[in-house]
């Protein structure tokens, strides 16, 4: 059973990594394509992306705030959201939307 779970986890991680590569470039994440995904997949890709950058990975409450601010706001909105983890996990981050990209910048520590 443990072997099956390991294989499923590996497959899941590969799926997220492949989706991430399709939705990202050096500027950030492609906002329009990201917004077409369901909440769960979008959340996992954002978490993967931030982790790859060495930034804090949002908990579920923070992820809901990201989703509300960026993906449920009016079309022309350009929100900026700053967060960090209380546990000090990785660097804090500022998320913003610019030129159809979701952009992350590490907070100075």
Feature annotation, model-predicted:
Residues 1-109:
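AMP-forming adenylation/ATP pyrophosphatase catalytic core
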């Amino acid at each position: 059973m443990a072997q099956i779970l390991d294989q499923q986890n590996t497959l899941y991680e590969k799926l997220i990594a492949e989706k991430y590569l399709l939705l990202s470039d050096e500027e950030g994440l492609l906002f329009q394509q990201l917004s077409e995904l369901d909440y769960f997949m979008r959340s996992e890709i954002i978490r993967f992306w931030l982790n790859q950058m060495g930034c804090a990975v949002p908990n579920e409450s923070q992820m809901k705030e990201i989703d509300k601010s960026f993906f449920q706001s009016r079309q022309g909105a350009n929100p900026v959201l700053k967060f960090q983890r209380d546990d000090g996990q990785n660097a804090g981050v500022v998320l913003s939307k610019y030129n159809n990209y979701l952009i992350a910048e590490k907070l100075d520590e």
